[in-house]
């Protein structure tokens, strides 16, 4: 996963953007104050695989364990040293796809372009929802695993702890908007599903297609917005 990168700190960028906006349109109403305890982080989640302990041993040998290579933003989660090859219909392949740990039910998360490359019609799903999803073949150095289901395009989502849920006045399963300001690509992404958990830090996950489309690496501002139903819907 790759985060927004800048030679300036997030607070510096937000301060400059607010100053410009205040001159042009008056003081904007931010979704969360800049001094919020838990800052908003937006990361790109590249294609990856989750594996059960059983599948780790099949693919990498008896007694094999996932070995952390790089720790991720969420505490306790990591990109492992191990990679696998994904094989789709008609023998289309994606080599060296990173495994993420720790172990959990086996699942493959792809971007839309990845699924096209593999020839797999992967539905957009919340992670863990494998109902009526396609499968694939995973190839490791010591063995092969055929997944009957579990290949998805991960729905863009935001991880929130209890204080974040309270601050944004949302609950797990709600959907939010993410506004990204970047030169030539300023965009608002809808349907960012909220995933609440007591142990997580505030973080939005987008896939590589979404991150590239909004030019996330050059973004100067990101903001989570709670959508409000049109007043006409109440009648």
Predicted regions mapped to residue ranges:
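Protein-protein interaction and targeting regions used for scaffolding, dimerization, and localization
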Residues: 1-38
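Serine/threonine-rich low-complexity intrinsically disordered regions
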Residues: 6-9, 35-38, 67, 104, ...
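Short, Lys/Arg- and Gly-enriched loop/turn segments at beta-strand edges
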Residues: 95, 184-192, 229-235
């Amino acid at each position: 996963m790759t985060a927004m990168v800048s030679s300036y700190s997030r607070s510096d960028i937000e301060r400059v953007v607010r100053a410009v906006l205040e001159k042009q349109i008056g003081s904007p109403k931010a979704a969360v104050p800049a001094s919020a305890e838990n800052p908003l982080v937006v990361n790109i989640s590249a294609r990856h695989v989750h594996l059960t302990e059983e599948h780790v041993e099949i693919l990498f040998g008896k007694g094999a364990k996932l070995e952390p290579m790089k720790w991720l933003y969420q505490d306790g989660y990591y990109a492992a040293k191990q990679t696998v090859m994904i094989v789709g219909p008609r023998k289309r392949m994606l080599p060296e796809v990173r495994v993420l740990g720790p172990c959990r039910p086996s699942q493959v998360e792809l971007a839309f372009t990845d699924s096209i490359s593999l020839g797999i019609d992967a539905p957009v799903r919340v992670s863990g929802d494998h109902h009526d999803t396609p499968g694939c073949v995973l190839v490791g150095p010591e063995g092969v695993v055929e997944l009957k289901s579990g290949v998805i395009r991960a729905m863009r989502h935001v991880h929130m702890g209890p204080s974040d849920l309270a601050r944004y006045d949302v609950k797990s399963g709600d959907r939010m908007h993410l506004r990204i300001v970047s030169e030539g690509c300023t965009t608002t992404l809808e349907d960012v599903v909220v995933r609440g958990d007591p142990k997580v830090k505030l973080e939005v996950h987008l896939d590589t297609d979404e991150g590239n489309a909004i030019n996330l690496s050059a973004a100067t501002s990101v903001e989570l917005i709670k959508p409000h139903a049109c007043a006409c819907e109440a009648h």
